[in-house]
Structure formats: C-alpha cells, structure tokens
C-alpha cells in the first residue's frame, strides 16, 4: 500500500466509538478464543469419579537416588522395573531399602519409613549383580616387588579422580611403608574406585541443623512479591558414603585422608611438608624408583 493512501485511510473518521471498539476487539492479537467463566458444562462426565479416585489413592513412595532399582525386591511391571512415579500402582506396600539411615524419613517428613536395612557390600560385590568379583591374591612377593606393583596399581585406576589421588599418595607414603602397611594398602586397592575416592575426600556427617538462608532486603522487595522462592544455599549436600566396618580403623585410610587434607587449600599451613603441601592433586607425579 502506498504512503498517501495509508495516510488517507488512517485519517478517515470512524462512524462511532462503538465501531472503533468492535474493530479493535475483532483485530486483537492472539490465537485463543474468548471463553466465558462458567465452564461447568465443559468437564467430561467421568471427571468427578476420576477426581475422587485420584484423591483416595495412597501417596506414591519416595525412592531416593541412592536406592538401587536393579535389585530383585524392587517392584516390577511386567518384565521391567516400574518407573519411580508408579511404584504404588505396582506395590502399595513397598518400602525402599536405602543404605543411608534416616534419609527417607528426612525427605518425606516422617510420612514414609525405610525398608529393611541391607548388609554392607563386601569386596567385589555390587548392587544388581549375582556374582562376586574376587580380587587376585599374590603370594611369595618380596617388599620391593610389592612396592613396584602397588605403585603401578595406584597410577592405573578406573577413573581420573582416583588416579590423581592414589598416585600422589603413593609418591609420598609408599616408600615409607613397612610390609604390614603394604599388605593393608594392597587389600585397600581392591575396593571400588568411587568408594575409595569418597571415603578419602568426604566430610563426616554432623549433627548440626541444616543450613538455612537469611532472606535479604533485595529478595524481600522483589522475590517475595513475585512469589519466587528464597534461595536454598547449603540445602544441597552430596550423599554420604559410610566407611564399612572393615576399614573403620584402617591406618591406610587415615593416611589417605591426611594426604587429602595436606594437599587442600585449607590444610596448607598444617601440612607436614611445605614443599608439597597445599599443591593440590592436579598432576600425576613422575614414576618413582624404589631401592628396596
């Protein structure tokens, strides 16, 4: 449309204010049709029955992310395990057996109880498998051979985190260990890599209250009015992996934790060696050659 014709069209007077309102209403933007507030007749005939059925059903069980669904006691729907949101439909009496006591009660506010506590896994055992991976037993090795083999096993792990952790630990402590400590460290390396990493790096659970936020003035002026939730700083915490009873009083685990503390930023000043303390675990050290 040309510019003079467009100006002439906009300058044309309307017939009446009512005509202007109806024109705007007819040309309003949007794809939704105008509906009256009274929608009682639009619901299906089965809506009341379905609503009553849903409200009378028991709440679905809460399954924490630390509860394995590959075990045989988890409810099945046909050949496969049911999704977590449909557990109550398959087995309304199912109680998840979480390895961490009190976690289910904490997340459900005491509404749901934990199932039967499972025994701690032994060496070579994993959730969901029916066999046991037995570690290799070596006999007749001298101290020099044991040190060389443990150095190799400390550097060639399954994940990068345990590679850095155990290789730096072996570089500092392996040459100072006696035969009994070497044998204990040999058994310790048979554990799963993620278990070793978390046992050495995690902080033990405390009895303190869960950290809570203090609402700031900015949030009171903006977030509180808009319905936004307050930030939950400190509410997230990684699942604690308890140390099994076989390593509760281990000297090797104590030295490994001390090694982590000495190489951390907070443990730099308390480190025994100022040359290596506080340097972190960012690099695998060079291969060490043992004389004996």
UniProtKB/Swiss-Prot annotation:
Transmembrane feature ranges: none
Region described as Disordered: spans on this chain: 27-68, 266-292
UniProt xrefs under InterPro entries: SDH (IPR005631), SDH_sf (IPR036714), SDHAF2 (IPR028882)
The keyword Aminoacyl-tRNA synthetase appears for this protein: no
First-listed, main subcellular location of the protein, grouped into a coarse class: mitochondrion
GO biological process: mitochondrial electron transport, succinate to ubiquinone; mitochondrial respiratory chain complex II assembly; protein-FAD linkage; tricarboxylic acid cycle
Disulfide bridge partners, by residue number: none
Biased composition, class Polar residues, residue ranges: 55-68
Signal sequence, renumbered to the chain: none
Localization terms from the record: Mitochondrion matrix
UniProtKB keywords: Chaperone, Mitochondrion
Any Gene Ontology CC annotation: mitochondrial matrix
More details: This protein may be expected to contain an N-terminal transit peptide but none has been predicted.
Assembly with partners or alone: Interacts with the flavoprotein subunit within the SDH catalytic dimer.
Known function: Plays an essential role in the assembly of succinate dehydrogenase (SDH), an enzyme complex (also referred to as respiratory complex II) that is a component of both the tricarboxylic acid (TCA) cycle and the mitochondrial electron transport chain, and which couples the oxidation of succinate to fumarate with the reduction of ubiquinone (coenzyme Q) to ubiquinol. Required for flavinylation (covalent attachment of FAD) of the flavoprotein subunit of the SDH catalytic dimer.
Family: Belongs to the SDHAF2 family.
Protein name: Succinate dehydrogenase assembly factor 2, mitochondrial
